[in-house]
């Protein structure tokens, strides 16, 4: 089966206070479009954990200490040709030094055998 990936779903975790800013940046960069609808996204509450090491430059936390933060996990659809631009715009407004980003290829139902 030879299926070409045309769209992906991008997931990113964001501190709750930055969710709207990240959503706006991503959707302004042409992600979140489904048919005739724009700014389409899903947001799920989550609890993030991490320990910044001595070389890290943490957003507001202490180095070498387990941190817990309430986050939103945003997900949105993106055309494969726009992914790099969308990620660039996302990183401009995301407060984390190393945002957690997942990119999942999607298969259109009409492309299934």
Task: Indicate residue ranges for each PLM-predicted region.
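Hydrophobic structural segments
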Residues: 1-113
């Amino acid at each position: 089966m030879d299926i070409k990936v045309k769209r992906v779903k991008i997931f990113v975790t964001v501190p709750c206070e930055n969710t709207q800013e990240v959503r706006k940046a991503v959707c302004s960069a042409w992600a979140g479009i489904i048919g005739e609808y724009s700014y389409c996204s899903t947001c799920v509450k989550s609890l993030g954990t991490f320990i910044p090491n001595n070389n890290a430059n943490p957003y507001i936390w202490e180095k070498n200490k387990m941190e817990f933060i309430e986050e939103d996990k945003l997900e949105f659809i993106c055309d494969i040709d726009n992914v790099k631009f969308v990620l660039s715009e996302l990183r401009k407004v995301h407060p984390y030094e190393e945002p957690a980003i997942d990119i999942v290829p999607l298969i259109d139902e009409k492309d299934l055998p």
